[in-house]
Amino acid sequence: MTAKFRKNLLLLLAAAAVGLSLYNGQLARRALAARPLGRFIHLRGTKLHFLEAGNGQPLLLLHGNGASAEDFTTSGIFGRAAARYRVLAFDRPGFGMSPRPAGRPWTAAAQADVIDAAVAKLGIGRYMVVGHSWGAAVALEMARRHRRSVAGVVVVAGYHYPSPRLALAISALPAVPLLGTVLRHALLPSLVRLNWHWAMKQIFHPATVAMPFAAMTRGLASRPSQLRSISAEPFLMLASALFPNRRYADIAVPVGIIAGAGDQLFDAKAEAVRLQSEISQALVDIVPDAGHMVHQSRPEAVLAMIDKIAALTSVGDRAEPSRSV
């Protein structure tokens, strides 16, 4: 291979990378433009986007890794819960329309603090919180760190006791500076779109894929900025596995724990039972014929658990606070 040939090859690859980056950027803008716009709240050098509906006891909904607030609208949980609760579905930092500022680790604890601060700025005193998958880790941190605010928790398909796994390390590679930047902008968006159907089958198995969720999330999850957040969360989970600092026994509020019996990502049933053993006021529901996306396949199970946990919270928590920002 001559020096001239190598030079031309590098130029060709660089041009292809730039072209792919521009194309992926255009698709990312289209994906954002296609989603419904909710409200923004600005605080702590960032902003959070959320959807809101209903009246009654405040109920926060936190999505998992790679998703956004629409996870709960497409499942029907958002609309059905709004008949009884004041529901706020957040885009967690780095997902949907909520940015994830660089320069600080967005751990579950950091996300818990900023979301609780946002809720307080909205004038809400006490609330319940539902978290799916990575959102479950944030919900539990909110219960531990903000005891005066959290009245009850429902965790869905949570990986509460992560172990060091090669898959976590590989998933975190796109978060690596320089190399990760090139991958996220040039190569990964196309790979994500090509493998989307396979990924959906894996997380929904043994249930069928919910097409409204799959269609809504595909464009958002393949954006370069969101791919950075998607890959950062396995890195944080790996760090948590290597240096565990879990104190679930500190949680003093009612907690509902839901897991799909057929979850293909990890042993969700064992995770749920172990978590129940650590929390004094915990209820467990292992849902048959459901996988990691149990809230999409069986939303009625999640809604029923929300009502059970709400019934265990004090009556005083049910007063609706001011909506002033």
What is each of the regions a protein language model found here?
Residues G262-F266, H292:
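Acidic catalytic loop of the alpha/beta-hydrolase fold
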Residues E52-M97:
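Conserved HGGG/HGGXW glycine-rich cap/lid loop of the alpha/beta-hydrolase fold
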Residues S280-V325:
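Catalytic active-site module of serine/aspartate enzymes centered on a nucleophile-bearing elbow/loop
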Residues R144, V153-H185:
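Flexible "cap/lid" loop of the alpha/beta hydrolase fold
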Residues R29, L166-A167, L188-D250:
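Conserved alpha/beta-hydrolase catalytic His-Asp/Glu region
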Residues M1-K47, A120-K121, R145, R184, ...:
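Short amphipathic, positively biased membrane-proximal segments
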Residues I251, I257-A259:
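Short beta-strand/loop motif that positions the catalytic acidic residue
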